[in-house]
Every structure is written in structure tokens, then in C-alpha cells.
């Protein structure tokens, strides 16, 4: 089994001048990555609290991650796009001794020691540092949104990270020394899917920043220059990129493998991608942050596309057990499961339990099994009750997306006095209806919905949008869409 820190030491010996991480013109070789990590680990070696790693897509953020694991304290990644109040809440909860600031933004240190990249660049020592991290130590803590408004810090052990990385290395069909693309900010655990499998196989990690996401031409230039082999992103980010007409195998011959996680992979998106890249390996994966990124996978083939709609998320990875509670809630058990939420025993006890002496996580996701494959069918908390009828918003969204003229869809419940009074369907259209007026298109959409679902589930209003906003993590921003509609 590959050990991440050991793999990096081996890579430094075998490929010292190979580029490990690249962001625009900023690059770090494997030698530089290891040496800077040793210097930072030496600086923080006596701390018992996690290292805050702050910035946006700087290669030095990964230096901070590796250094923190070598020092045995682990890290908490924070992106500069996060609101200041949220950052301060997280820092207060973690109470770190050190903050590694890789950006030009200033942070309120509140008496804590701030280390910046300049500190490492001007340190002329040669430092040999023997890694202190043990399997049971926390490798990283990633904060996710909490239903109470206070973010939850998900703690992942080093052994869980190594197990996940080895599974990804086994899934990867195209071997070592590849060019990987990472779309997700480091504060989102999808980035873990790119960082460690790439570095464990002596690849080069190419980082996509906010500017590239907002200007597809810059992304196109990066894809062409870096000759990307492995793509890791949310499905929503891929949907946006498929608007680039030359995103196809004929133009990007090097692009051979895709990994998707973080959201449901829509059937239409997968079908279009497979048409554009017929010889590529396309993986649909599923997993919550609380279970170390992803716990299932399936290779999307033409046969899978033809047989299943919606698409399955596949089979559980080795060492992980999946089961269903009575209400169809998916339960994940195994070494992948988080240690719990940092300094939050109450919320940890609500969702982390021992089943047959195995640590288990109650996901809040509804699931089903068909043909030995797992399907995610919605969220327990996406159920609403309208006029006495209980319904799944995601089921309505699924049927909206099956309509030819609909490219993407979100269903927004409208509340009055804490009660749902109506549903509104918000859709982005394909370019198939130029000759029809808005009311005709709305009528056609509702007529098609009537073929698939009861009248009471059909949204009262259909609202058109040019495009949907994405969160900083590259997912559909449901909250922003709802606020825009209800404003």
C-alpha cells in the first residue's frame, strides 16, 4: 500500500526536476516540494494543533499540506473566496499555533504566528525531516456547511487518506507520470481526489483557478499547453466546459480519463462527454466529505448510458460497506469514515455511530440498489410536503432534465408561514426552441411533465434563466438560485 509521504520522498529521488505542481507560471518540482515541506515541518514541529493553510490555488498550499502531515499535526485548508466571518469562525474553533498564508491577503492573526511563502523562499537551510505522522493521526480537517449555520469540521485520519489514495491509484487506467487537472478549491474535498493520487504516481498537478473558470478561453489555453491526461471536477464544471466546441478527443488527444464527484452526474452530460471522448475512461463516483471523498465508482460506458437513466454511482470500494436504514438512508461503514466533527460531540453523535464494531456514517442521502449497483435517489432533507403530498424535489428535477429543450433544472419550494404553498421550476434551455414564444415553451414543458408525474408534483411556475450560478466549489448554487427566484 502506497504511503503518501513515502511516495513523495521516492519521487524526489527518482524525478527531482519533474514538475509536481503547476499554476500558470508558478511551478514546484518534486525536489522543491519536498524541501520546502521539510523546512515548514521543522518550523511547526512542536505544535499539537492543525496548521491553517490559506490561499487560492498556490502550489505552496500543497507544501503546507505535506509539511503539516510530516509534522504530525494535519492541516485545515481555507480559500480566499470564503467570507471573512466564516474564516474567523473556523480559526477560532481550530485555535491554531500557526497560519500558513500563501496569498497576498492579510489575515487577522490574533496573536498566532503567521508564516508566509517568503519565509520558506529565504530559508537557505537544507533540512532533513523524518515524518512524524501515524495512521490514526488526523491528516486534514475540511469544513462543510452545517444546517445550524455554523460550519462543521470533518476530520480525516492519515490511514483513511492513504486507503483512498491507493483505491484511486488502482482505478487510474493510464499509469504514472500523467498531467492531472484539479478544478476544486483546496477547501473542498474534491481536490483531495486530484492532489494525492497525482502526487503518489509522480504526476504533475495543474491547478484551475477562479479566473480560468470565469474565462473559458484561459482554461482552453491551459488544456492545450499542459496536455492534460486526467480530469477531476464536479459535473457542473464539466457541463460548463462542454460549451467549448473543441472540447473533444479530436482536439485534445492527450485527455484520456475523467473523474467526477461532488454532485449527481446527469445522464445528458455523461452521454455528450462519451460522444466527444469515445475512447476515454469516464468515472462516476460518489461520497460525502465524512467518508474521505468517495466510496463508490463506476466506469461509464455506452452500455451503462443505454441501460440506466439516472446513472448509477457504482459499487463500494474495497474495505467499505454500504447499507440502508429503514427510511432508505445510505449508511457508510469502514476505515473511510471520519473521526467526527472537530470539537462538536453533539453533531458527531447524531450521524457517526458504531454498527457491528465498525465506525459508520449516516449520510442523509437516499439510495437504492439495482443489478448490484448503487443509485443515489435524493436527499432526506430535499423532501417537501405540498397539499398533504410528500414528494422529492430531485425527482421533479430529474423529469425536467429529461425534456429535450431543458439543459438544466432546479425546483424551488415557496414557503408561507413555514408551509410549502407551491413549487417553481427554474430551467436553463437548450438552443432548440428559437421559433417558439415563452408561453408555448412553458406549456410544452408542463405537458411533458404530465406524462411522467402526477399533477400535484408539477411546478406552478416555470422560470427561465440564461445560466445557473456555481458555488466556489463548482457545484450548482441552489441557495443563490432560490434567492434570485424568490426575491
From Swiss-Prot:
Catalytic activity: holo-[D-alanyl-carrier protein] + D-alanine + ATP = D-alanyl-[D-alanyl-carrier protein] + AMP + diphosphate
Annotated ATP binding sites: 144-145, 284-289, 365, 475
UniProtKB keywords: ATP-binding, Cytoplasm, Ligase, Nucleotide-binding
GO BP, sorted A to Z: lipoteichoic acid biosynthetic process
Function field: Catalyzes the first step in the D-alanylation of lipoteichoic acid (LTA), the activation of D-alanine and its transfer onto the D-alanyl carrier protein (Dcp) DltC. In an ATP-dependent two-step reaction, forms a high energy D-alanyl-AMP intermediate, followed by transfer of the D-alanyl residue as a thiol ester to the phosphopantheinyl prosthetic group of the Dcp. D-alanylation of LTA plays an important role in modulating the properties of the cell wall in Gram-positive bacteria, influencing the net charge of the cell wall.
UniProt-listed PANTHER family: ENZYME, PUTATIVE (JCVI)-RELATED (PTHR45398:SF1), PTHR45398
Protein name: D-alanine--D-alanyl carrier protein ligase
Native source organism of the sequence: Staphylococcus xylosus
Organism lineage string: Bacteria, Bacillati, Bacillota, Bacilli, Bacillales
This protein's encoding gene: dltA
